[in-house]
């Protein structure tokens, strides 16, 4: 039997977030995670087990390596589907996450900027799907790319997203099946429910907020505002 896992990491980072000596982000993200996982437990339609990795790391580089190794070890332990959702995400309506129709490693929506370096279409990697049918070649590609990490200009922030985009775009997925913004609505500057803010984000994502199933807040900026908004949304949709 194939198991389903919802995974996330909220780790103390010794050197701080992007070299900012801030301990408040860890506390903020712990609060966000509790709201996030509660939303997935309410709305995900398939059975799943939630896992949170909390072991401390020295810096952002170690953070990405630790998360990759944890996901890889879990995937190789038993037949399973793994859905990664960052702590600053919230699900807002019933959703099938672990569909057998999806056979490949997935990202779901653009990030900001929408293009970057060798990627004309650059996707956000804080929501990812590792199905049990994911190919060994894509796992191997992800492993091989660690050899490019040391000394890379984006080593301490962004390299992992480059690596994940390389894995995603290497696969033979129909172009019509790559973009699924309703599973990763990018709410990067959404901090209130003002009509103006919502409309700006609807335009960016190409869908209406009310049609989104998962929102991603990019909460290292305006963390307390995000917590307040996640609490508001949680009450509105009956999570708390």
Where are these regions (language model features)?
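Catalytic core and acceptor-binding pocket of nucleotide-sugar-dependent glycosyltransferases
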Residues: 127-238
């Amino acid at each position: 039997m194939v198991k389903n896992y919802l995974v996330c990491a909220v780790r103390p980072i010794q050197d701080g977030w992007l070299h900012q000596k801030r301990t408040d982000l860890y506390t903020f993200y712990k609060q966000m995670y509790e709201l996030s996982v509660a939303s997935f437990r309410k709305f995900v339609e398939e059975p799943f087990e939630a896992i949170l990795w909390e072991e401390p790391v020295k810096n952002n580089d170690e953070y990405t390596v630790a998360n990759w190794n944890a996901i890889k070890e879990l995937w190789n332990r038993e037949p399973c589907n793994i859905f990664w959702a960052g702590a600053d995400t919230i699900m807002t309506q019933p959703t099938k996450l672990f569909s057998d129709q999806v056979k490949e490693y997935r990202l779901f929506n653009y990030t900001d900027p929408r293009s970057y370096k060798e990627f004309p279409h650059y996707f956000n990697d804080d929501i990812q799907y590792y199905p049990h049918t994911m190919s060994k070649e894509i796992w191997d590609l992800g492993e091989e790319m660690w050899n490019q990490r040391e000394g890379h200009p984006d080593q301490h922030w962004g390299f992992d997203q480059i690596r994940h985009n390389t894995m995603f775009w290497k696969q033979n997925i129909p172009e019509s099946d790559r973009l699924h913004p309703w599973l990763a609505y990018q709410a990067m500057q959404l901090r209130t429910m003002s009509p103006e803010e919502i409309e700006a984000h609807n335009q960016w994502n190409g869908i209406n907020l009310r049609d989104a199933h998962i929102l991603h807040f990019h909460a290292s900026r305006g963390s307390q505002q995000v917590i307040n908004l996640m609490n508001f949304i949680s009450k509105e949709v009956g999570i708390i």
